[in-house]
């Protein structure tokens, strides 16, 4: 593919959805674009505000915690895998509404609790819920706080 065609395709892609530079570099590499041309294309996209890692990180954080029900740890891992700078990640994470975040964690844990067999002991349920919530990326301190709340155990029976 010619670099001119690649620019047009990436501009179209970036106009439709947020992208990060590492994803675009991977696409360019897959299309057989040379490293030097890739760098020029990425610079063009940044200069013309088609791509912005700050904007991408904020959208990623917002989507993953609100719509996918992910915790901070899983979001951080996802952004690191996209090679987003730590400072950008921290800034994006600071926009999380802590009340909403705790509510999302509570709902995820309560939903999982309702799926667990009744014959399991409370300790076994606790262990499974900790593993579940940790795999979703929620912090252990938040998980324990939710598991220690009477509201969780009473809401699962209704």
Named regions from a protein language model:
Residues 1-158:
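An alpha-helical, amphipathic repeat domain used for nucleic-acid recognition
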């Amino acid at each position: 593919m010619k670099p001119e065609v690649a620019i047009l395709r990436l501009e179209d892609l970036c106009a439709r959805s947020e992208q990060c530079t590492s994803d675009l570099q991977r696409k360019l590499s897959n299309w057989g674009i040379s490293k030097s041309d890739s760098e020029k294309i990425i610079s063009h996209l940044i200069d013309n505000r088609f791509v912005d890692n700050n904007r991408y990180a904020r959208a990623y954080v917002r989507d993953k915690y609100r719509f996918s029900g992910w915790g901070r740890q899983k979001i951080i891992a996802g952004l690191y895998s996209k090679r987003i700078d730590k400072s950008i990640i921290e800034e994006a994470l600071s926009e999380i509404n802590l009340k909403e975040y705790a509510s999302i964690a509570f709902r995820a844990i309560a939903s999982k609790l309702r799926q667990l067999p009744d014959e399991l002991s409370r300790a076994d349920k606790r262990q499974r819920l900790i593993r579940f919530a940790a795999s979703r990326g929620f912090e252990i301190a938040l998980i324990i706080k939710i598991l220690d709340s009477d509201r969780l155990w009473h809401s699962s029976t209704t």
